[in-house]
């Protein structure tokens, strides 16, 4: 069996310098190669200040790492683009770019599929196929920057997959994306969304890297949450909120609670008041997301009046809340609509 090659995009700059030592090369070559990677080098022969002997050696044991754009869809109603990327093993992942006036945000996937089973989300329908490696998450951002010529300023880990279910690779990706000689995206411009894997939430907090944490809550009641989110069978709302409080304490960052509003399921005045009571005193914000249509599901978004009544009820009880503007829904690129194949 052919030995699997080492993917250089999986390394930080310091790690690449260490890798040079393992192949009997000077560490400074690692910095040169790192620079070439982020200048867009596609092959080792593009690196014209690297000796031919080293390029040949690298060719034998390693590769740079590339995913390919299979398809790009552009929204007709807003500045959203959805990319379908083809991975080396033939799997497909989806990534969304949102071009705002003041920033460019990319929503990356971190798994092929998802095993969390949230029953309003398209990403989980085929289950989990595999985790993405750090470089495969990273290259979504690189390829979008190359395609558009625009610098990505903000990043959300809200595509297919649960980041904390792929924790080690997510953690390494966060180190790489922050590299000053790489893409240099600051931690305060990165948001990680989780459905609440409590032990990993504590581990994330202990990293003390101060990224923004978004918690998919969707109901103030354990019983109701278990019906729409199977992960709720493993962790109660109380356990999740305690982990959120710990995260706030360690990072001094506000936690965002994502709440998908589903008509007749979780959109009543009673639930708004229960949610406000639950979050009282926390450094937090509620992001209300009118459910986006997934053709295999019967869920519907509430009428606009109900949506804003829910928001007003939270704010009346001193819980900051906004209604998220849904972008990319006409290309199935909105929250909950990403999947591992194009339909």
UniProtKB/Swiss-Prot annotation:
Binds 1 [4Fe-4S] cluster. The cluster is coordinated with 3 cysteines and an exchangeable S-adenosyl-L-methionine. One of its GO terms (biological process) is rRNA base methylation. GO terms for cellular component: cytoplasm. Its main location: cytoplasm. It holds the Pfam family Radical_SAM. It catalyses: adenosine(2503) in 23S rRNA + 2 reduced [2Fe-2S]-[ferredoxin] + 2 S-adenosyl-L-methionine = 2-methyladenosine(2503) in 23S rRNA + 5'-deoxyadenosine + L-methionine + 2 oxidized [2Fe-2S]-[ferredoxin] + S-adenosyl-L-homocysteine; adenosine(37) in tRNA + 2 reduced [2Fe-2S]-[ferredoxin] + 2 S-adenosyl-L-methionine = 2-methyladenosine(37) in tRNA + 5'-deoxyadenosine + L-methionine + 2 oxidized [2Fe-2S]-[ferredoxin] + S-adenosyl-L-homocysteine. Keywords: 4Fe-4S, Cytoplasm, Disulfide bond, Iron, Iron-sulfur, Metal-binding, Methyltransferase, rRNA processing, S-adenosyl-L-methionine, Transferase, tRNA processing. S-adenosyl-L-methionine binds at residues 161-162, 193, 216-218, 292. Its EC number is 2.1.1.192. GO terms for molecular function: 4 iron, 4 sulfur cluster binding; metal ion binding; rRNA (adenine(2503)-C2-)-methyltransferase activity; rRNA binding; tRNA (adenine(37)-C2)-methyltransferase activity; tRNA binding. Specifically methylates position 2 of adenine 2503 in 23S rRNA and position 2 of adenine 37 in tRNAs. NCBIfam families: rRNA_mod_RlmN (TIGR00048). This is Probable dual-specificity RNA methyltransferase RlmN.
